[in-house]
Amino acid sequence: MWRVCARRVQSAVPRAGFRARWATLKGPRTGPAAVRCGSGIPSYGVRSLCGWSYGSATVPRNRILQQLLGSPSRRSYSLPPHQKVPLPSLSPTMQAGTIARWEKKEGEKISEGDLIAEVETDKATVGFESLEECYMAKILVPEGTRDVPVGSIICITVEKPQDIEAFKNYTLDSATAATQAAPAPAAAPAAAPAAPSASAPGSSYPVHMQIVLPALSPTMTMGTVQRWEKKVGEKLSEGDLLAEIETDKATIGFEVQEEGYLAKILVPEGTRDVPLGTPLCIIVEKQEDIAAFADYRPTEVTSLKPQAPPPVPPPVAAVPPIPQPLAPTPSAAPAGPKGRVFVSPLAKKLAAEKGIDLTQVKGTGPEGRIIKKDIDSFVPTKAAPAAAAAAPPGPRVAPTPAGVFIDIPISNIRRVIAQRLMQSKQTIPHYYLSVDVNMGEVLLVRKELNKMLEGKGKISVNDFIIKASALACLKVPEANSSWMDTVIRQNHVVDVSVAVSTPAGLITPIVFNAHIKGLETIASDVVSLASKAREGKLQPHEFQGGTFTISNLGMFGIKNFSAIINPPQACILAIGASEDKLIPADNEKGFDVASVMSVTLSCDHRVVDGAVGAQWLAEFKKYLEKPVTMLL
């Protein structure tokens, strides 16, 4: 009776009387304005903010429909025939879901193909459609209910309209009682479900779209609303940037796909650690509907407020260079407010620079928050005059400088980097192999190629390294593998991750199919990816994945170093600087001066044995010392 509509699903074998239709996003369905993630993000069948969660290519299998349809209709003999619709497991990892929206109301007829409801899972928002005609008798789980366990009954449908009235006061408790025993006078009526609060989304509000925080990467569990690009009341045109969200991987901008108006911002700018599925804002189609949402406050975000940065310890005041009395009398200082200090990031920075104790500043911002104006107008209270009692001169105390350190909040990206690096060092048995490579031939070939490409771009030494690494991975595929706990996955294509340092932290954009690309194409890809990485404009598909990683610190003069493996990859190549060295030669002098580069290969010993790692380095060295062999 039900079917699931989602996208990015390759196959599903329908059961008798049921089939699955997977909707596409190319033609947005009618209704409130849809919002999509940055235009560069591949759709993957996911609507980012308007209920569709990005970040998983996991494909639901036939068991989705089996779980959805596997429970036969449970009928209570004291009630007309009806169908109990349970919440199925719509992804391999789903344990609970959120009723994003009911498309049908109680009493309405449901025709074949009608959309009944949208359920937000841990992977995407999945819509249910009817394959048969029926009537919505009772909605048991209100719209907006979060963390509904899999298997919970969410609604009741009946075949005949005259049966709807029998379920007017239907609850799951009353149904259980009816099936367990014969009819008997109830001791007390069951408590009715709590009515939705006046501030909760409901039918009293105009037609609107509640925008929720989706999963923008496979490992994302929360995000930070870095900046709102639109204000309440502003018109949203197609292509406008709505907001920027900092995930555990990068900062991603959301663009508006259809016209509308921003009616309400539910999560203030700068709010950190916002859980997935939290409503972010409200969008309406008509400008006159904006005023209706002035006091709109869904229950999911009533307690969500911007988190204050870690409190700055009060700076130690400089001790005046006067003799210290034997029994000093503490000067009376005004007691600051107890508890948490709410302060904007800019005000906190200014206070640290000026050495101002935030507990003594009275905030004039929303809910008493300290803002820049409060710091600028703050006048510190004068300390009580020192006692005039004479005291024997004592040793002078060296003044302690104010603001000797600053606490830098940890971004989501930095936190994830720390977690993954710790995981790598604790779970992967690293070992390291080093070799010197004569770069003389590469430098000559590079010089000739750049003359040919003059005005079109330049090929760097790093581009030769990427190409040689990719070809070596084809020759020694064990190094182009991944540890998957139960199997070792050997990849047939080489996607080279290139470590790039950005203000937000280290990120590894990917040169896909590096083994079949020419040097000019690799150079163009690297320049584009590095620029986007430093500007924070990388899309998730551009840095998630990869089969082999290169980290180059040679441009900083580092001779050699050992890099940490990027799981689940098995190897990472650390590139050091080139330096001139004397090498034996068959000439009159008996030696030549060569530009020699030191490289170190970090290997996962579970996947790559020492001999295999040495074999890979030999192939890599051969390609660089005779770059013409890259053409074979």
Curated annotation (Swiss-Prot):
Keywords from the named record: Acetylation, Acyltransferase, Carbohydrate metabolism, Glucose metabolism, Lipoyl, Mitochondrion, Phosphoprotein, Repeat, Transferase, Transit peptide, Tricarboxylic acid cycle
PROSITE patterns associated with the record: BIOTINYL_LIPOYL, LIPOYL, PSBD
GO cellular component: mitochondrial matrix; mitochondrion; pyruvate dehydrogenase complex
Chain positions with N6-acetyllysine modification: K451
Catalytic activity: N(6)-[(R)-dihydrolipoyl]-L-lysyl-[protein] + acetyl-CoA = N(6)-[(R)-S(8)-acetyldihydrolipoyl]-L-lysyl-[protein] + CoA
Main subcellular localisation: mitochondrion
The species this protein was found in: Rattus norvegicus
Enzyme Commission code(s) on record: 2.3.1.12
GO molecular function, one term: nucleotide binding
UniProt xrefs under Pfam families: 2-oxoacid_dh, Biotin_lipoyl, E3_binding
NCBIfam families listed in its UniProt record: PDHac_trf_mito
Lipoyl-binding domain sequence ranges: 82-158, 208-284
Record's protein name: Dihydrolipoyllysine-residue acetyltransferase component of pyruvate dehydrogenase complex, mitochondrial
Keyword field contains Transit peptide: yes
Cofactor binding summary note: Binds 2 lipoyl cofactors covalently.
Residues recorded with modification N6-succinyllysine: K458, K532
UniProt-listed InterPro entries: 2-oxoA_DH_lipoyl-BS, 2-oxoacid_DH_actylTfrase, Biotin_lipoyl, CAT-like_dom_sf, E2/Pdx1, E3-bd_dom_sf, LAT1, PSBD
Residues binding CoA: R446, S460, S551, N552, G576
Tissue expression profile of the protein: Expressed in flagella of epididymal sperm.
